[in-house]
Curated annotation (Swiss-Prot):
Matches recorded under InterPro entries: Ribosomal_uL4, Ribosomal_uL4-like, Ribosomal_uL4_dom_sf
Classification via Pfam families: Ribosomal_L4 (PF00573)
Gene3D superfamilies: 3.40.1370.10
Region (Disordered): 49-106
Keyword rRNA-binding recorded: yes
Protein's recorded name: Large ribosomal subunit protein uL4
Alphabetically ordered keywords of this record: Ribonucleoprotein, Ribosomal protein, RNA-binding, rRNA-binding
Family assignment from sequence similarity: Belongs to the universal ribosomal protein uL4 family.
UniProt entry tagged with the keyword RNA-binding: yes
GO cellular component: ribonucleoprotein complex; ribosome
One of the record's GO molecular function terms: rRNA binding
Length: 223
């Protein structure tokens, strides 16, 4: 059977003025692959676990202060025998099997991380939720009002992931205070943030950087 040809998706590139400035291709190997839900769940779970601080700690009966005295004599009271006021059944006593500081991070292979990200982006692309723009605001002066109006013209959904180049300070300053908008550089793209967002907005610069970094080798993707 002949190998099935991969399709190439095309999306319009929008300007802050609302005009179409050409189109850009989304490679099928990155934006049209099957979404493996179990894989994405595993990667997101590992990513969220790695973000946990893990400094929680409780004291056992040997660590709480006090408790050297026997609360009452062994026999003759009619009550159950007790050896310390810091036993777990007493108020102020130690905690049994309580949490201790630990590392929650899990080892996830880079290929699995990259595959999960491709699946998440493909799901958004197939549903028309990936957008390309020339820039967030015209010129070098930040404008939250202009950026908000521009994003509203692209999508009415609330959670938006904006992927722009690290050098685009005007764009970052324009949207960093907008509710529901999250900003990432192309090398920071991850499965969790893509799935959490309703729409993903790429600048042409960031989209080209992501494609260039992942079409030759799909292993180098940030966790």
């Amino acid at each position: 059977m002949a190998a099935q040809e991969q399709k190439t998706l095309k999306i319009d590139v929008k300007t802050p003025a609302g005009k179409v400035d050409g189109a850009i291709e989304l490679p099928a190997e990155l934006f049209d692959v099957p979404a493996n839900i179990a894989l994405m769940h595993q990667v997101v779970t590992a990513q969220r676990a790695a973000a946990r601080q893990g400094t929680h700690s409780t004291k056992t009966r040997g660590e709480v202060s006090g408790g050297g005295r026997k609360p009452y004599r062994q026999k003759g009271t009619g009550r159950a025998r007790q050896g310390s006021t810091r036993a777990p059944q007493f108020t102020g006593g130690g905690v049994v099997h309580g949490p201790k500081p630990r590392d929650y991070s899990q080892r996830t292979p880079k290929k699995m991380i990259a595959a999960a990200l491709r699946g998440a982006l493909s799901d958004r692309a197939r549903n028309g939720r990936i957008h390309a723009i020339t820039e967030l605001v015209e010129g070098q002066n930040p404008s939250t009002k202009s950026a908000r109006a521009f994003l509203a013209s692209l999508t009415e959904r609330k959670q938006v992931l904006v992927v722009i180049g690290r050098s685009d300070e005007a764009g970052a300053k324009s949207v960093r205070n907008l509710p529901g908008v999250h900003i990432l550089a192309p090398d920071q793209l991850n499965t969790y943030d893509v799935l959490r967002a309703d729409d993903v907005v790429f600048s042409v610069e960031a989209l080209n950087a992501y494609i260039a970094a992942n079409t030759t080798t799909s292993e180098e993707v940030s966790a």
